[in-house]
């Protein structure tokens, strides 16, 4: 079926293409645009994901619909008053207790059961709204509801308590009798001071019939004329308060005091704005204004002295002629009071009163955050202390990665590191030592994840378990051939032994007669009439191929140590023993060249005993076999010993039915086939068409070849095979595995590349400390020989680079490999060498004609080698030639002064006899007087023989010497001439 495109799927799913692209990204699929195609399995997964999301979305409303709704507050109509308003002397009707408002409806103002409905005062015209009674009550009721909705989320004001207070403040005294509050609970809990005079009470009763009393409503939203509408309703003519014509402030009237401080007021009220109770606070709208129906800034009072509903704005302790907080005003003299409290609406000239609760909350939150910061200040920055917590970072991590983990600023970490004596940028990769120093200072235990753990975590993201082979059942395991590595010193006959076993002649094709790459072969031998397969790995014996020998020891099951009977144990023999013992691999010793004159196999046995290889005839457990690979003597006994050792000490079984896994033995770049990797399958079976990942290389297996170049369809465990189809040349020793598809293989390879690049940067970018700053400047003056290495195989390039980096000539010169690669020398290599003034080394590779012409035009030197030790010798000689020359002083002549001639034009002229050597004009000289050098830095400015100017005078001749302006010479002085000659450095 055809592959669907993204926009087509978006149409089918009834979503836009952007949503589909984001969903694909979340699923781990990388799609470029909406017109890109995707695989049918991915499309099915995508549809399933959308179906799952839709199912989740449908279940949410259903679940929410099942929740019971909050029980509404029961609305009750207010009961009719028990007596008409005219009967003021009748007993008051007790008010029913207010119902507790539920949290769901805390903002609703339910009328109190049993409370009387507000009625117009006598004298008001029927049908006309009385100011401060019905119209003001209704409009302000709406404004208060709006305000309560806005202030519902403020944490600093308790909603439930405030709403209850507002409801209770609406209570009016029944039958016109002041002092009877409608909320019994509030009256019982709030302290009420005694009335300080009866005049106030009587005056309050008289005034209650003439002047309408304002209701205790919510605070005014604000009166800033420069701001937009602040929640206030549009006033109607009946709502506009009219000042009393006789309202004038008296001298004794005072303003309300600060809430929370007892004053001189008559009653006990509570400020409305801010929700904080105030002691006293009976101030009216303005001091001494009678008849003003606008609630003042004083708190509510309880009638005249003790009664009255609480209401009004938050205010203070005023008393006297002011409004009594919504109660009856008193006609008596003002009782004084303090200054008005904080709060109030924002005015035209800025906000008055204290800061808002939001600002207080932010200040408290900042204070809390400040107290949480317990780390010491380092360099002016404050970083939270980790208290020894452990944090894991990847290899090559930077300060930016650490800052993201512990949630601090990157610049702060840079500052701390600078004060610790280290200089690094926020994005620079750091090593483990620097992270440990920084972590110890800020209280964090920083650990860098090893490369193996990081790779294991990466593979687990793609459902690949590297420990799967340890969890195999015994029924799934089947026998596999042993992997045998042939190791030993160079020219001891390793490749000759393999040629004899395979009946081939590989050694004739090796440059210089030495092996410079790992060869993998599989042969079939007969053991007791039964055919058995053995996989052989031939490792180089030259000292430059240490990494190859170590790699071969890690991949092998049994090691054959080849030792020449005439040479005995050599340095690379000891190294091979150490590699095998480190890998815990059993060793079978093959004493070769027993047919050569001077061969002494017993000497070899005695030498190897010192390294823990004791022969069986000496009471040990190591098998020794005397062979001659050239004459094919006892080779069959050697193979028999290998198989017996493998059967006795090893469990050679593997599961051939799982996905293939193994190691890359060798890799090269073929001109016609591309990247060719020789791999050894260790688990499972590798098939043509599998998607594989080898290190940072990936691809699909296009073809597989055996060691003879014959195509193969499948390769089982312990089978060496050449794989074609990789996008790049992998590194020798990289593990390979089979991925689920090409996309997963590419993602694994790309993430490995990023990890490897970061690790290399961490090693290359050494953090410069302040103490080493001068040292780094001195190192910048070192002459570096830049080299570009190109070779035919990955292992050869690696071995050549390691060998060149080990060359130590002097501290004044060094080697820097700016690029290395596998394959022919390309134009990019020449361009890179041109910029960096580098030398290109071609190991078994050549450039084409165009690249060679370009290198000649640019003056780039290309050196070709086929044997590794010749390349090492030439580079070492080049480094010695780069050394700065050293000079030493060489005495050339001695001349005795026998006469002094004085000249007004030239000064003193010494007549000398040359005793030895040759005197030359312009050479340096010194004066020796009685065997002591009086003056050193002199120069022979003129040299004459009689009247002729000469260049030199030899031994036994007389001459006249003028020393320029120096005239302090005496008879008998010796003029010694010398030269500075360059000395060859070693």
From Swiss-Prot:
GO (cellular component) term, any one: cytosol
Places the protein is found: Cytoplasm
UniProt biased composition (Basic residues): 357-366
InterPro entries named in the record: EF-G-like_DII, IF2_II, IF2_N, P-loop_NTPase, Small_GTP-bd, T_Tr_GTP-bd_dom, TF_IF2_bacterial-like, TIF_IF2
Region (G1): 488-495
Annotated stretches, region: Disordered: 49-370
Bias (Low complexity): 60-112, 170-182
TM segment ranges: none
Family label: Belongs to the TRAFAC class translation factor GTPase superfamily. Classic translation factor GTPase family. IF-2 subfamily.
Protein name, per record: Translation initiation factor IF-2
Organism: Bifidobacterium longum subsp. infantis (strain ATCC 15697 / DSM 20088 / JCM 1222 / NCTC 11817 / S12)
